[in-house]
C-alpha cells in the first residue's frame, strides 16, 4: 500500500507542477478556432449550454504541444544523424564533461542566482534540502 501511495503522490505532484496542463493562459487565442459550446433551448426563456470536450483549454494546449513536438522535422533528422555518426556522440559527451562545458553551466547557475529574488532562493534551497530527506524517508519506510 505504501508503494502505491508514493506512486500516486508522485503522479499528482507531476500533474500539479506541469505548467502546460494547469494553466489556460496560453490557449486563449486558440479558442477562437472552434466554438466551445452548443446552446440548446430548453424552453422559451431558458437555454442549456453543453460544453464540448475540444473546448477544454488546458487539455487542448497540452495536446497541441505534444503534436508540435513530434511534428518538428528537425528533431528527428538530428536524432537520425546522431545515430549514424557515433563519433559525433562521443564528441558531444567530451564537450559536456570537459572543464569548458562545466564552466558554462556554472556561469549559467551564477547568472540565475544573481537574478533571482530572496523568495526564489529560499524555495530552491528548501527543495534541495527536502528532496534528500524525502528520499531517505521513503527508503526507510519501504524497508519495513
From Swiss-Prot:
Glycans are attached at residue 115. Residues 1-24 form the signal peptide. It comes from the Eukaryota. The keyword Signal applies. It is found in: Secreted; Host endoplasmic reticulum membrane. Keywords: Glycoprotein, Host endoplasmic reticulum, Host membrane, Membrane, Secreted, Signal, Transmembrane, Transmembrane helix, Virulence. Its main location: secreted. Induction: Expression is induced during host plant infection. The chain crosses the membrane at residues 122-142. It is a single-pass membrane protein. Disruption phenotype: Decreases virulence on both potato and Nicitiana benthamiana. A motif (RxLR-dEER) lies at residues 49-58. Interacts with the C-terminal portions the ER-associated potato NAC transcription factors NTP1 and NTP2. Belongs to the RxLR effector family. Effector that is required for full virulence. Targets host NTP1 and NTP2 transcription factors and prevents their pathogen-associated molecular pattern (PAMP)-triggered re-localization from the endoplasmic reticulum into the nucleus, where they contribute to prevent disease progression by P.infestans. This is RxLR effector protein PITG_03192.
Amino acid at each position: 500500500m505504501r508503494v502505491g501511495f508514493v506512486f500516486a503522490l508522485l503522479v499528482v505532484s507531476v500533474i500539479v507542477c506541469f505548467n502546460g496542463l494547469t494553466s489556460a493562459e496560453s490557449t486563449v487565442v486558440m479558442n477562437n478556432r472552434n466554438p466551445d459550446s452548443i446552446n440548446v433551448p430548453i424552453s422559451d426563456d431558458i437555454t442549456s449550454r453543453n460544453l464540448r470536450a475540444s473546448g477544454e483549454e488546458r487539455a487542448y494546449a497540452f495536446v497541441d504541444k505534444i503534436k508540435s513536438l513530434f511534428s518538428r522535422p528537425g528533431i528527428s533528422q538530428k536524432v537520425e544523424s546522431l545515430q549514424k555518426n557515433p563519433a559525433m556522440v562521443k564528441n558531444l559527451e567530451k564537450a559536456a564533461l570537459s572543464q569548458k562545458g562545466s564552466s558554462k553551466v556554472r556561469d549559467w547557475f551564477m547568472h540565475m542566482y544573481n537574478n533571482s529574488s530572496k523568495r526564489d532562493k529560499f524555495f530552491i534551497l528548501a527543495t534541495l534540502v527536502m528532496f534528500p530527506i524525502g528520499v531517505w524517508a521513503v527508503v526507510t519506510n519501504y524497508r519495513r
